[in-house]
Amino acid sequence: MAPKKKVAGLIKLQIVAGQANPAPPVGPALGQHGVNIMEFCKAYNAATENQRGNVIPVEITVYEDRSFTFTLKTPPAAKLLLKAAGVAKGSAEPHKTKVAKVTWDQVREIAETKKTDLNANDVDAAAKIIAGTARSMGITVE
């Protein structure tokens, strides 16, 4: 077995799927760790090709020899809720002004998608987490 590579850094970014380019925020974040920026952009765009339009968080592990690996996460719950509710942004005063409504079925569907990234044991617990996010955005869950 080959010796383990030493980790030099961990970078977390949220990039629109299929649209990673060397411009900020991607370029500076990777450049300071000495990563080949174009190599990452091509790999990320290829990996997220089928999810175009969604914001996909990525966790990039940079090693001392300047090589890297990355893990794709599920889209942020807030973005999925906005898409389900059909609104551009959440409420400025979430507990006073409600901007939209989503059904429990939509919340459960989002919870199914997010379950791997959430700290929940089952779909019901994940749905409660998503409902809490909706509430804090001014979206009513029915």
UniProtKB/Swiss-Prot annotation:
Keywords annotated in UniProt: Isopeptide bond, Methylation, Ribonucleoprotein, Ribosomal protein, RNA-binding, rRNA-binding, Ubl conjugation
BP-aspect Gene Ontology terms: translation
Q: SMART domains under this entry?
A: RL11
UniProt xrefs under SUPFAM superfamilies: Ribosomal L11/L12e N-terminal domain, Ribosomal protein L11, C-terminal domain
Q: Which PROSITE patterns does this entry report, sorted A to Z?
A: RIBOSOMAL_L11
Q: Which GO terms describe its molecular function?
A: large ribosomal subunit rRNA binding; structural constituent of ribosome
Tell me the residues linked by Isoglutamyl lysine isopeptide (Lys-Gln) (interchain with Q-Cter in protein Pup). 101
Recorded family membership: Belongs to the universal ribosomal protein uL11 family.
Q: What is this protein called?
A: Large ribosomal subunit protein uL11
Enumerate the InterPro entries for this protein.
Answer: Ribosomal_uL11 (IPR000911), Ribosomal_uL11_bac-typ (IPR006519), Ribosomal_uL11_C (IPR020783), Ribosomal_uL11_C_sf (IPR036769), Ribosomal_uL11_CS (IPR020785), Ribosomal_uL11_N (IPR020784), Ribosomal_uL11_N_sf (IPR036796)
Quote the PTM field: One or more lysine residues are methylated.
Any one of the GO CC terms: cytosolic large ribosomal subunit
Disulphide-bridged cysteine pairs: none
Task: Tell me the subunit arrangement.
Answer: Part of the ribosomal stalk of the 50S ribosomal subunit. Interacts with L10 and the large rRNA to form the base of the stalk. L10 forms an elongated spine to which L12 dimers bind in a sequential fashion forming a multimeric L10(L12)X complex.
Give one Pfam family: Ribosomal_L11
Function summary: Forms part of the ribosomal stalk which helps the ribosome interact with GTP-bound translation factors.
